UniProtKB/Swiss-Prot annotation:
This is Protein CROWDED NUCLEI 4. The keyword Plastid does not apply. GO terms for cellular component: chromocenter; cytoplasm; nuclear lamina; nuclear membrane; nuclear periphery; nucleoplasm. Disruption phenotype: Reduced nuclear size associated with reduced chromocenter number and altered nuclear morphology. Plants lacking both CRWN1 and CRWN4 or both CRWN2 and CRWN4 exhibit slightly smaller rosettes. Plants lacking CRWN1, CRWN2 and CRWN4 or CRWN1, CRWN3 and CRWN4 are extremely stunted and set few seed. It comes from Arabidopsis thaliana.
Amino acid sequence: MATSSRSERFPITPSTAATNRLTITPNSRVLKSPLTEEIMWKRLKDAGFDEQSIKNRDKAALIAYIAKLESEVYDYQHNMGLLLLEKNELSSQYEEIKASVDESDLTHMREKSAYVSALAEAKKREESLKKDVGIAKECISSLEKTLHEMRAECAETKVSAGSTMSEAHVMIEDALKKLADAEAKMRAAEALQAEANRYHRIAERKLKEVESREDDLTRRLASFKSECETKENEMVIERQTLNERRKSLQQEHERLLDAQVSLNQREDHIFARSQELAELEKGLDTAKTTFEEERKAFEDKKSNLEIALALCAKREEAVSERESSLLKKEQELLVAEEKIASKESELIQNVLANQEVILRKRKSDVEAELECKSKSVEVEIESKRRAWELREVDIKQREDLVGEKEHDLEVQSRALAEKEKDITEKSFNLDEKEKNLVATEEDINRKTTMLEDEKERLRKLDLELQQSLTSLEDKRKRVDSATQKLEALKSETSELSTLEMKLKEELDDLRAQKLEMLAEADRLKVEKAKFEAEWEHIDVKREELRKEAEYITRQREAFSMYLKDERDNIKEERDALRNQHKNDVESLNREREEFMNKMVEEHSEWLSKIQRERADFLLGIEMQKRELEYCIENKREELENSSRDREKAFEQEKKLEEERIQSLKEMAEKELEHVQVELKRLDAERLEIKLDRERREREWAELKDSVEELKVQREKLETQRHMLRAERDEIRHEIEELKKLENLKVALDDMSMAKMQLSNLERSWEKVSALKQKVVSRDDELDLQNGVSTVSNSEDGYNSSMERQNGLTPSSATPFSWIKRCTNLIFKTSPEKSTLMHHYEEEGGVPSEKLKLESSRREEKAYTEGLSIAVERLEAGRKRRGNTSGDETSEPSNNKKRKHDVTQKYSDEADTQSVISSPQNVPEDKHELPSSQTQTPSGMVVISETVKITRVTCETEVTNKVTTLDCSESPSEAGRKMGEETEDGDCNQTGINASETVIHNEAATEDICT
């Protein structure tokens, strides 16, 4: 009942709104708060809230609001933990990207070293070609030397003409051997040609590898773009989640503002209540002044009130006992608070343990995810390795297939045409797939133009070769004419021998060159393996290739200049050789003419004899010479073609590598741009997180400030409460003194009336003593039952004790026994007085004057106690009416109903009790007391006064006890407790029971007296 009235008095509390708002958020923890109501109350007490004032308000709303604040703090902590986890994930991704970039740098350095080694190998090849050219020059010089030697030997042949014929047959056999050697040389030349073809195949294989790498790069680009798209989608999702979090935080901020508004309203209400208390204090001051005036009037009467002081001492002892019981209760409350604090600490520890367990689970989940990712990465790496191995197998198969192809110019042209077709097809496919790769088409067009330029250059080189061949044919013709003129010479046999020696030396040189070529082939195989091993790390060298691109272009230009210079030098050497050859031919012609003149002059006769044999021999020699010259020319042409082919292949490889480097540069630039964009995004997210942190810290600081303000208000309220308590104690003490004085005044007034009635009572006392002896046992039982009823009323409440007494007491009780019982119930005489009365009754003698005085004193004491109780209840009713005026205005209908119910209840109980004293007992009483009929009016004066007092007290209790729940065990202390109720606000159900027992007793006395 009290809580409903208080909730109506405070309709401003945000109980429903706060709880309804809290249920909106999905992550709210209002219903899952680990704190109980006891812990909440303890925290409120520590924060400075008054329990009495809080109980007058809506407890549930305040607890829900506190739980809401705590849940919001928990949500903030949870969100902060999630943000930290996201930060750690982003940092790990950044470190992975950084590690991949470092690996790309390392691979780029390795590719750079491989490229430098390839350039060195190309230089070595050029040097070997230069050596071959020098060897050809040496052969030409050796041939010239042989011609000079032939001239010298021609003179010797003049002397040994006869011996030459026999040696000619031997020379024929030697020529046959030389033919076999020449065939062996041809085979060696074919082997060299096969090696050249093999190098060409290797070059084609490298081209195919480059194409496969381009395909891999395109695939990687596609995969990288897909990954970028997935990452962008993830970032969009994360931004959406962040926006949702911002909205939730804004809603929470609005809720905090609403809560602040409600707190301000409550503060205004507290201020109004404080003003009301100030007005009450003013009223108390006025009452103090009136009480002081009355005290001055009653100071003269203190000497005659020693008996009242003794009673006050007893009451003080009872009060001290009550205070001791209250202290015990306070100690029990302190123990309970300590238990609650221990429970709260245990709950906090449990919550912390649960949070730690949750964090550990999250850490384990994150570690498991990282392990899964690492495993997936390892699986991808293994799959890539397997793919590379499969590609190597495919490359080897392709190499075997390419080895079966022909390496003629027609096949190369067809291959170039096919490559052009493939490139065009690839370009169309790439245009269909990606419209952004227009640059690749331009590169392909450039490649086609470069190939056409190379074709034109090859054509020019073919024309130059044809011109050189024509010039060489002219030279050959001249040499043939010179050799034909020298056919007549016998010294040609010696020339053949020298030629054989030189050919042997050339064969040895060729064998050595072949061994060198084999060694170079092995070395190239090793380098190929290294190159293939390092080719896998090309992606890492992208950034270094950017820096070295300019250096490579410079080297390329220097290398091109170097090649041009070497070509110019070769041309100059050719021209010099041509000039030397012309000079030598002219000198040979001159010497031949001189020699011929001499021979004609000296050996005209000898030549005529051996012309036939010489002609046959010279024909064979000429054939052999022609064959040897043809072989030499073929070898030269093959060497030149192989050198040209190597240069072409090297230039093609160089161009392809340059294009690949450019593509890798572009890819690396794109990746760097993407990484920069991601870094910028991460920086923006970090700034947002920092701003969120600052905002949360500001909110937390505002909350702390509000808590500090509440603490200050708590201290102020505590000081006010202590002041009010001190004033209350003073007022209570003064009221008690005034009540005592009033009781004494009333007792003195009643003493005169009691003395007048004693004479009448002494006459009836003798007759009543006999009846008292019969009722002693019943009175004892009634006293015991009254004690039990008071205890049961203090514990269980309501009217159980009175019902027992009504059921146990017989209907044949006398009116005097009922009067005594009512006086015992109302005034509660001590057991000592009852024992004295029983003693006097047992003696059965006539009461003396001493007995009369004692009985008069007892009556006076009972009368004064009844008056004091009535005055205290009246004062309590006045105070209660003053305090509950606002409540009565808000709830008039409820109070009326309650009063009507209570009065009806009490009237019903009084009727039931009056039925017990039915009219059947009246004649018996009249029959037993015939002599006292005339004295009954005088004896009923006191009873009528007590009835009036009890009626007044009953009305005050009925009007006041409807809205209060606090009282004590005895009716004498009920008034004091009711006075304390207005300031303390304690509610106790046992007070209703005790007040009801008093009302029942008073109603019973009224019925009996009537």
